[in-house]
A protein has these predicted regions:
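Flexible, polar/low-complexity N-terminal or interdomain linker segments that lie immediately upstream
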Residues: 1-32, 86, 108-186, 197
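Terminal peptide-recognition signature
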Residues: 10, 38, 96, 114, ...
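Short, acidic/turn-prone active-site loops that include or flank metal/cofactor-
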Residues: 43-48, 110-111, 197-203, 258-262
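Helix-loop module immediately N-terminal to the HCX5R catalytic loop
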Residues: 48-77, 198-229
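Thiolate-centered catalytic microenvironments shared by cysteine-dependent enzyme domains
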Residues: 51-159, 238-260
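Short cysteine clusters
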Residues: 233
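Cysteine-dependent PTP/DSP-like catalytic domain, specifically the C-terminal lobe
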Residues: 256-272
């Protein structure tokens, strides 16, 4: 399953009305420069902060309101971009997948690399004028009713603590800690293995390594396609990017524990 989409393809489809481009970098960098027709979506928009501090996926009503406001429905292809050193774009892609969007992709290179390659970028004031012109276009020019996103939750790509407890000693399950070695050895879910999310990004602005490189890395760690994979990190952000890396490499049974260590720590089952 190809998670990424080619930058050259996007550059040639920037004005396509059936594509929604999402900038995951935050509003300040967005205002400075962004890809033409992109819309900003901060990480906080796709997170529900639980009482214990866990960063959980937003519920269906929230997702429907949010994604509809961005012009997303099931007929639109969604392309999310960000920076390779920031896993936020991965969490947004995973959130859309969890809520059942059928066609969401991660831009294959970072925004910095997009600029470096000479692809077009715009400033906020130019983009605002473009949006104004579109809003003033007559109905007969293709402007119809506003998009309506309908959540169709896919529970197979999400795990919670109770589910993990039933899988900790299952030889057919691999639990991946996508954090740093320091974090892993300080406190981790018993039985989990370390696979830092940064090991799955490229060295030249690629959001995800080549499939060949991913396969080699995963197999060396015993992360094989015949296993069910559960990813976690601190608050489920880096784990979401690791999920995309696994899907890109052709792994079918992959889940994200979005509660991650913040949620697990409340259950007093950590190895320290």
């Amino acid at each position: 399953m190809m998670i990424t989409i080619d930058a050259n393809w996007l550059a040639s489809h920037l004005d396509c009305p059936d594509i929604v481009i999402i900038d995951a970098r935050g509003i300040i960098p967005y205002r400075f420069r962004h890809i033409q027709n992109a819309k900003p979506l901060g990480l906080e928009g796709v997170i529900l902060v639980a009482d214990n501090g866990a960063n959980l996926v937003i519920d269906p009503p929230t997702a429907e309101k949010l994604f509809s406001s961005l012009g997303i429905d099931e007929s639109k292809k969604v392309v999310v971009y960000g920076e390779s050193i920031d896993p936020s774009a991965g969490r947004i892609v995973w959130t859309l997948m969890y809520h059942g969007h059928p066609d969401v992709k991660l831009l294959d290179i970072s925004f910095s690399q997009w600029q470096k390659a000479g692809f077009p970028v715009v400033r906020e004031e130019i983009q605002a004028q473009r949006q104004k012109e579109k809003a003033e276009a007559p109905i007969g020019n293709g402007v119809g009713p506003p998009p309506r996103f309908k959540s169709k939750v896919n529970p197979t790509i999400r795990a919670d603590a109770d589910y993990i407890k039933t899988k900790q000693v299952d030889p057919n399950v691999v639990i991946i800690d996508a954090r740093t070695p320091q974090e892993h050895f300080q406190a981790r879910i018993p039985g989990s293995i370390l696979d830092n999310w940064e090991e799955g990004i490229g060295q030249n602005g690629e959001m995800i390594k080549s499939i060949t490189e991913l396969e080699k890395d995963f197999e060396e760690k015993g992360i094989t396609r015949d296993k069910e994979i559960i990813c976690y990190c601190h608050v489920g952000i880096r784990a979401s990017h690791k999920y995309l890396q696994l899907k890109q490499a052709g792994y079918d049974r992959v889940k994200v524990y979005d509660g991650s260590i913040i949620d697990w720590a409340q259950r007093r089952n950590l190895i320290r």
